Regions:
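Conserved helicase RecA-like core
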Residues: 1-251
Length: 251
């Protein structure tokens, strides 16, 4: 179990990268490391982190996610990748179509397994685990290992596992200031939101809403109020999602 901010991504990437370098294969082949994530954004983030850590090495890293045209995954089909970071849905599609070879996978890593369970991906993950049954190692990472669902899931996938718990640091939390605002009604809430977003120190802000339809409505309202914004929601093409994240990152 490793809560957000404990460095779990580097904790599993560094050992597998070192393993690939210590035991190189004689010729190119299917991926040796398979990392599953619940969302496209996390898959891209993990892959970018892996590329940074693997800079100046011969290791190849690719992603397989939904929202991307079939032809853009040609690099994975070429059987010249060491690490593949994927979301379950698109990967399972390629496995069923026999476009992805699982037989060389040595290590299967499940990042944010609790979220994948919450999103209903348990059956897909077990199917993928069955396709990689020749693997030597399985790693499961979760914000918490409490609850019967995640425990039962871990027992089905892991064989005699070693449990490691990372304690989150409280040092960084002290830098976070939190406020709670009570609005009288929807109109008041919108005016309050616009007021807060127009403050000088609101340089980069993320606003969460409950429904996808509300995302579009709120984005338009803010634009009409002169507040520059972009939105992200699940039905967007991946190129649009990536563009939105880049705009937020660049400010």
């Amino acid at each position: 179990s490793a809560p957000t901010g404990t460095g779990k991504t580097a904790a599993y990437l560094l050992p597998v990268l070192q393993h690939l370098l210590d035991f190189p294969r004689k010729k190119s082949g299917p991926p040796r490391i398979l990392i599953l994530t619940p969302t496209r954004e996390l898959a891209m983030q993990v892959a970018d982190h892996a590329r940074e850590l693997a800079a100046n090495t011969h290791l190849d890293i690719a992603t397989i996610t939904g929202g991307v045209a079939y032809m853009n995954h040609a690099e994975v089909f070429s059987e010249n990748q060491d690490i593949v970071v994927a979301t379950t849905g698109r990967l399972l599609q390629y496995i069923k179509e026999e476009n992805f070879d699982c037989r060389a996978v040595e290590t299967l890593i499940l990042d944010e397994a609790d979220r994948m369970l919450d999103m209903g991906f348990a059956q897909d993950i077990e199917h993928i685990a069955g396709e990689t049954r020749w693997r030597n190692q399985t790693m499961l990472f979760s914000a918490t290992l409490e609850g019967e669902a995640i425990k039962d899931f871990a027992e089905r996938l892991l064989e005699d596992p070693v449990e490691v718990s990372a304690t989150p640091s409280t040092r960084e939390r002290k830098k976070i200031h939190q406020w709670y605002y009570r609005a009288d009604n929807l109109e008041h809430k919108l005016e309050l939101l616009k007021h807060l977003l127009k403050q000088e120190d609101a340089l980069r802000t993320i606003v969460f809403v409950r429904k996808r339809e509300r995302v579009h409505e709120l984005a338009e309202m803010l634009r009409n109020a002169g507040i520059n914004n972009c939105y992200l929601e699940g039905e967007m093409a991946q190129i649009k999602r990536t563009e939105g994240i880049k705009r937020l990152t660049d400010g």
